[in-house]
Amino acid sequence: MKDKLVRFGVSLEGGLLRKFDSYIGAEGYDNRSKAIADLIRKEFVSDVFEKGGTVAGAVTIVYDHHKREVVNKLLDIQHDHGGIIISAQHVHLDHDNCLEIIAVRGAGAKVRSLADALKSVKGVKHSTLSVTTSGK
């Protein structure tokens, strides 16, 4: 059963509201309500992540696949964190560079540990971690 929408008022300084309207317009929002709801959800996900609650997300890394020691180290790290890895996708960006997208679900601290271990490997050119709600 879906929650019933509840209307409430928000008071803001004029300058802050103008900045907010500019921001949500650039982000493609049609109305303030959806933008505010998304910002609230984003903060809740951040709070869950920081407190070690269950999150889902993706770790992305770019590396040179010709450097075998990098590939082997990345695989070892992934196997060491198998309990939180849902899947991994390997993409050939060009002749030298590969993109790995690793889908994860687990405690925020474990997800952060995996992301930190992967990005610290010498030869990883770029790494990002994106987290969202696990749906619960």
Specify the residue positions occupied by each region the protein language model found.
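Short Lys/Arg-rich basic patches
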Residues: 1-11, 24
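Short amphipathic alpha-helical segments
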Residues: 8-12, 20, 30-41
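Solvent-exposed alpha-helical segments within well-ordered globular domains of core cellular machineries
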Residues: 18, 22, 34-38, 72, ...
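Alpha-helix boundary/capping and short turn/kink residues
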Residues: 26-29, 108
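Short, charge-rich, low-complexity interaction segments located
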Residues: 36, 45-52
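Conserved, well-folded catalytic cores of nucleic-acid-processing
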Residues: 42-47, 77-80
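Short, solvent-exposed charged binding patches
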Residues: 56-136
